[in-house]
Amino acid sequence: SAVSNRGEKFDPAIQPTLNMYNEYFGGGMNAIVFQEMRESRGLAYSAGAFLITPSKLKYPYVYRTFIATQNDKMIDAMKAFDEIINNMPESEKAFNLAKDALITRLRTERITKSDVLWSYLNAQDLGLNTDSRKELFEKAQTMTLPEIKAFQEKWVKGRTYIYCVLGDEKDLDLKGLSQYGPIQKLTQEELFGY
């Protein structure tokens, strides 16, 4: 798992593109991350990457990635992941699948019961007074892959990360892992409190 925080604050103008980027790049089984890491390269059981929208105005955007892989494939998986994050593969077919999936989800998603209140309060926490899904739905219709690439270049490429690796130390390539920065080993008690 890796996390990157550059301190960027909430910007409603980027939200439609951010949502489409997440759908295209890091979303489900048709997303670039899953297709590249699992299907094409066989380096992961599961993988994902998302630019996470802050829940309040005072919080920053955070980029979060995860890879579930075998210990002996860890370094290769990390290198491949860094490569596709910084040099995002472009596939018009995958983009159209992502676009259709996002539009379909927006068409069928309903906010009901107590979720109406929670959605309203969450919007208020971000300084919004309308349902942001409306703008997302409208902009998604005409969004293009070059727009997603430009977003990736500005908001994702070149980030620095804090990595978290879980595994049996004797099975991990610590020398290879050290190329990503200093290694800090944590005990079970430090992680879980027992």
Model-assigned labels for residue ranges:
Residues 1-6, 165-194:
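An aromatic/glycine/proline-enriched structural segment found at the starts
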Residues 1-32, 66, 193-194:
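His/Glu-based metal-binding/catalytic segments typifying zinc-dependent metallopeptidases
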Residues 19, 31, 122, 134-137, ...:
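A generic, residue-level signal for flexible/boundary positions that often mark functional hotspots
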Residues 29, 73, 170-173:
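Short phosphate-engaging motifs
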Residues 1-11, 34-87, 92-145, 153, ...:
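M16 family metallopeptidases and their MPP-like homologs
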